[in-house]
């Protein structure tokens, strides 16, 4: 499996969205940039903010699309073209309703599962053959409550759990960057004793 070269966090831009559950992907790449000392800069040709990070001996591009969640594919595909990166070398971090807060899961390939940022990316790529980091935000219990749930802020306990999941995913990332995606999955998916 190809080593990762681009890590994208999905979210909505602007301070009013900064702490929402839907911005779990932004939270991941922001934490990654902070841990590595990478600095964000606006890149209008890529429709987002970019940073260059050094992680475990690998140079990786970070991207936060500024297009709003539903149009994330525009920024992602522009970055893939500009940096000549294959979709298989892409990791997209996003919020996941079907996972409890405190849970993060890596996967490769698949559908969008109702996540509109993934939906747009898959539509523009023509396939779903890229890596994903699913950051659990929990489900409100009924589909009619999903929109206010994802656009709302998590309570203190859930917010702490999401932060722990982000940290665990960052800790597993060097394995994925080395091309050992299955080992990274095993590390992240195995409960700590």
From Swiss-Prot:
Transmembrane stretches, start-end: none
Site (Discriminates between blocked and unblocked aminoacyl-tRNA) residue list: 12
Function recorded in the entry: Hydrolyzes ribosome-free peptidyl-tRNAs (with 1 or more amino acids incorporated), which drop off the ribosome during protein synthesis, or as a result of ribosome stalling.
Top-level taxonomy: Bacteria, Pseudomonadati, Pseudomonadota, Gammaproteobacteria, Lysobacterales
Annotated site residues (Stabilizes the basic form of H active site to accept a proton) in this chain: 95
Catalytic residues identified in the record: 22
CDD domains on file: PTH
EC number(s) from the headed UniProt entry: 3.1.1.29
Xref: HAMAP family: Pept_tRNA_hydro_bact (MF_00083)
InterPro entries registered for this protein in UniProt: Pept_tRNA_hydro (IPR001328), Pept_tRNA_hydro_CS (IPR018171), Pept_tRNA_hydro_sf (IPR036416)
Protein name as annotated: Peptidyl-tRNA hydrolase
Chain sites annotated for binding tRNA: 17, 68, 70, 116
Keyword Cytoplasm applies: yes
